[in-house]
Amino acid sequence: MSKRHSGYQRQRDDVNETPFWVTRVVLPYLQQHCLHVWDPANGPASKIAQVLSGEGFDVIATSDDFLARTSLPHANIDSICTDPPYGRDGGRLACRFIEHALELVPVVVMLLRIDFDSGKTRTYLFLDCGSFAHKIVLLDRIVWFEREGADPSGNHAWYIWNSKHNGSPSIEYAGGERT
């Protein structure tokens, strides 16, 4: 698999909303394991929060400094579901998001690049982490920014950690038309 530059000129603090279909892909897992979900990275108007609220989840969405938080925004939060910032440091910011989320809640659901679990420096989050439970590979590419003549170039997956998980992680494939 190769990566190519999209040609999109990023702006400081620009927002790339997670499309509705992407969140719908992870609904079956969330419906089995979660009731009260926190999206700490996309703000109250996030599309993730909209989908989850529409499906009956109790959702809190914030966009403050997640890594500085030492407690949950509400005591009954049982999961975090978000599209974390990756940062320009090779994904280290996303790693810190995952680490912090695992300290706060029993179920963590993160939308990440498909090869995020491939790095040997991240084995502590995957291979060596008993709570890593499931990966849902998106068969359709996410269109983050509408641009004429541009095709999306990145592949993504939902990564799920569950403190109650026992055994090897599982993998599933899903796409926009299938949800």
PLM regions: where:
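Class I S-adenosyl-L-methionine-dependent methyltransferase catalytic core
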Residues: 1-179
